[in-house]
Amino acid sequence: VYNWGEYISNGSDDSVDVVAAFEKLTGIKVNYTTFDSNESMYAKLKSGAANYDVVIPSDYMVAKMIAEGMLAPLDYSNIPNSQNIDAVYRDPDYDPTNAYTVPYMLCTTGIIYNTTMVENAPTKWADLWDEQYAGNILMFNNSRDAYAIAAFKNGTSINPETPEEVDEVVETLKAQKPLVQAYVMDEIFDKMIGGEAAIGVYYSGDAITMIDDNPDLAWVFPEEGSVLSVDCMAVPATSEHKEAAEMFINFMCEPDIGKANAEYIGYTTPMQKVWDILDEDLKYSEIAYPSEEVEAKEKVFTALSDEVNSELDVKWSEMKSYDEGGSSLLFLALLAAMVALACFNIWRKLRKKTRNQY
């Protein structure tokens, strides 16, 4: 099983150990590993470096993987619990008739901030370009989510159709880069909980976890809109244990297992039967289950053309390596200081030698 980090109930904090429960029920041994972005997951599967039986990509990546023949059609006779998925999440654009995937969880992007370090609560994505937060901003370390934030700020589509659109939005990210402390994924947990940064961007379910660990943290859905993602369970075309994989997916759709996962990770369940039995705090959480006003502004990712996707990969890498001369200037300053120190030491030795001659 290849899943996002921090994305399953694992037995800690008195939670259910879902993997162990599946192993006990079926006798099937699960090798469980994690990834931190759709792109890293895709790259690993595409390279053939590892073979997995269950993966959990997001909607736009599902569409890409289906188009490239990377996913196997599901045998729903092995997944009867898929009927627990609400009808609204069936037959999606990214996987018509759900031939290849079963929804696992939903999430929305937003801003998390430390109320003791931020004087005025942020209200929009554009606040992440405010110089008052210089050195205290955490940004997504993946191209699609970071691009979407800049696109929201610019008032353009989060799904670019031309390389020129990509170039324009990445320039906006480049302008922000001097203000960014770090580009992160799961590293955000330690940084925000530990008060190492004032403001960051991440996913709604993880925000609930961070706020539970540090009550000084707060969350906001920016007024420009947010990205709504559906993370799905799927079986790679290269799987050697497809029936066992489908048994695992079926197990994850059990209401009590769905409840355990939703309560542990804080994400939004696609199953009404799970929502009905959730703890009250999560059931009525405005982060996990936002208002209709927030939902009306949500956008979803779609798969990009190969040309646009390639342009985004290239421009994202260039942006990440761009330092506006800052690193070069720092290197030159350090080099000058080292030369000056060396010259000073040579002068002292010569002066001492001269004195000793007298």
Predicted regions: what is each one?
Residues 292-358:
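Conserved C-terminal helix/tail region of periplasmic/extracytoplasmic solute-binding proteins
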Residues 138-142, 146, 150, 158-222:
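Ligand-binding pocket segment of bilobal, Venus flytrap-like solute-binding proteins
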Residues 50-56, 72-111, 136-138:
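A structural signal for short loop-to-beta-strand junctions that line the ligand-binding cleft
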Residues 72-83, 101, 215-227, 236-239:
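Short beta-strand->loop
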Residues 1-64, 190:
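Early extracytoplasmic/lumenal segment of secretory-pathway proteins
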Residues 66-73, 93-99, 209-221, 283-286:
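Ligand-binding "clamshell"
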Residues 236-296:
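Mature extracytoplasmic/periplasmic domains
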Residues 127-141:
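Short loop->beta-strand "edge-of-pocket" segments that line small-molecule binding or catalytic clefts
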